[in-house]
From Swiss-Prot:
Protein name: Weak neurotoxin 5
Upper taxonomic lineage: Eukaryota, Metazoa, Chordata, Craniata, Vertebrata
Family: Belongs to the three-finger toxin family. Ancestral subfamily. Orphan group II sub-subfamily.
Function: Binds with low affinity to muscular (alpha-1-beta-1-delta-epsilon/CHRNA1-CHRNB1-CHRND-CHRNE) and very low affinity to neuronal (alpha-7/CHRNA7) nicotinic acetylcholine receptor (nAChR).
Organism: Naja naja (Indian cobra)
GO CC term (a single one): extracellular region
Gene Ontology molecular function terms on file: toxin activity
Length: 62
């Protein structure tokens, strides 16, 4: 699985996930402004504030 890993909304940097990391995620936090966290995870992350989107195909966290 390959996921995007940039902190910007429009990202072209990809990362090959490690064994056991089967999820790509995108986390957006409105409190901090336009901040995006993208990457790989074993499970979909949970957050107290903001929005998280998870998916399981290559580069799906755009």
């Amino acid at each position: 699985l390959t996921c995007l890993i940039c902190p910007e909304k429009y990202c072209n940097k990809v990362h090959t996930c490690l064994n056991g990391e089967n999820i790509c995620f995108k986390r957006f936090n409105r409190i901090l402004g336009k901040r995006y966290d993208l990457g790989c995870a074993a499970t979909c992350p949970t957050v107290k504030t903001g929005i998280v989107q998870c998916c399981s195909t290559d580069k799906c966290n755009h």
